[in-house]
Amino acid sequence: MITMKNILKLRATGLLLLLLLMISVLGNGIGQAMAADRVYLDITAPETRKIKVAVPWFTNTGEGGMKARIAKDIADTVAKALKFHGIISIIPTSEYKGRQTADWAKLGADYAVLGSYKMFPKKIKLEIRLLDVAENNIILGKSYKGSMSQQNPMIFKFCDAAIKSLTGTEGIASSRIAFVSYEKRTKDVFMTDILGRRIRQVTRHNNLVVSPRFTRDGNFLSYSSYHSGSQKLYITDLRQAKITKSLSRRKGMNLAPTWAPDGKSCILTLSKYGAPDLFRINQQGKILEQLTSRAGVNVSPTYSADGRHIVFVSDRSGRPQLYLMELETKQTKRLTYDGRENAEPNWSPVENKIAYSSLRDGLYQIFTLDPFSAAPPKQLTSDLTRHESPVWSPDGNQILFTQYDGRRQQIYAIMKNGSYQRRVFSFPGSQSSARWAR
């Protein structure tokens, strides 16, 4: 028979079981919760504290004893590559004299990178581990062996794996940055790593080269050159440096393509019929379709990650503004209304966010917007210099842009929340028009 007394007894028993279950879950999860406190789901939120990492000097496990310069150089490269991601704070080695036996918890470290190296004739072996300080547990271990010229790429691979262990997203230490360098009245395209350690000259036209663009897989790079007397579009196979071919040699403009996600076609600006319009061409340069046919200028297309939309710049309203086009229907709508001019859009590879430059109070500043949202654009830069040519990092967390201080152009980076703005390279001459690929 069900009575009020039995009901109360059942309720009490249920509450007790629920309480015991909660205690059990909490007891088993305390260690996990402590570790979870250091894994930040929104790693670019303004209020998120940076992950504190110690990178002591590497130890020598081979013959010849400790080689201080090598030990310090390897650790320094690891530290700089991790810090570049904008979510890592490196504890200075001066606080623990670079020793691997330091009390990491006392130093306030969340993690420590512990490594060793061994020299071979013309080769080096690296053993690198990532220690979770709170758990006193190695959460990542990697071993690499290669030529001395492969030392930095091996370090970058570890850093990418370490960032993935901490955030769930692969790092960008192994990514490549292409840019235009201006020196001695010529512009050519160069390519380098995130730290500017290894530089490769991609073009040698001894003329003006503009608008480098990676294909989505990063294996090819297209650019426009004036070396033949007029602007032509070329593409080079980065895996085979000498393989370069003409992609479009049409009369007039052949400019700034955006490559489709499948890499089989690109959209660029051609002026073969007079006005600069957007066309889609295949890998052989054949025109597949014309996308715009209105008076005015239509330039700077950028593909969405799914390949269904583009954002581009048009002055059809009187001044340059951003427009969104659905490629299947060709439906187009204006996106920007604030700012005297809005130009150079670049679509994030991981989300619906457009980075672009906007002319405000006489200066170009970097903004971002969601093309499918009514939310207002977000301003990232505000200092009294000129900011142009924004481009997203492969992980969608950072933006490179060109800053002009009235004397020279330099490449800067900033997190997508507007934090950690800094100059990226210290090369001679001027650098601009950066592009980023894995």
Swiss-Prot record:
Cross-referenced InterPro entries: 6-blade_b-propeller_TolB-like, PD40, Tol-Pal_TolB, TolB_N
Keywords: Cell cycle, Cell division, Periplasm, Signal
Subcellular location: Periplasm
Keyword Cell division tagged: yes
Role: Part of the Tol-Pal system, which plays a role in outer membrane invagination during cell division and is important for maintaining outer membrane integrity.
Subunit annotation: The Tol-Pal system is composed of five core proteins: the inner membrane proteins TolA, TolQ and TolR, the periplasmic protein TolB and the outer membrane protein Pal. They form a network linking the inner and outer membranes and the peptidoglycan layer.
Protein name: Tol-Pal system protein TolB
